[in-house]
């Protein structure tokens, strides 16, 4: 959605619309989402449905098992305040190619950014 929200607000918006924040069960879905996010939808990142349930243990908000990941090098990490507990997909390329669309980063859940909801069939 083009609306910018914290991860928690995005979660609530998706639930209110009978959906979930998008989960990524495999590379095929990750590639689809990477291609789906059009220029202008997101600034640098876009919320997905992953969150750090316990330190070092990631889960999907829809309850599906965590079977796939596509972390950027050095991620997930933690900041001094230990608030990087939510998953975002990178939507831009850095000049040095250290960041590229489709890679994942753990981000402070309070930051506001675009997000993707999904609905079960």
Model region roles, listed by residue range:
Residues 1-121:
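Extracellular, disulfide-bonded carbohydrate-recognition/adhesion ectodomains
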């Amino acid at each position: 959605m083009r609306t910018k929200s914290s991860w928690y607000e995005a979660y609530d918006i998706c639930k209110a619309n009978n959906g979930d924040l998008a989960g990524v069960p495999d590379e095929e879905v990750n590639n689809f989402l990477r291609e789906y996010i059009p220029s202008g939808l997101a600034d640098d990142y876009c919320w997905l449905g992953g969150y750090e349930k316990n330190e070092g243990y990631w889960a999907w908000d829809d309850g599906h098992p965590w079977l796939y990941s596509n972390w950027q090098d050095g991620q997930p990490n933690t900041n001094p305040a230990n608030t990087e507990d939510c998953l975002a997909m990178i939507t831009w390329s850095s000049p040095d190619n250290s960041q590229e669309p489709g890679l994942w980063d753990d981000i402070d859940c309070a930051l506001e950014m675009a997000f993707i909801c999904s609905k079960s069939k």
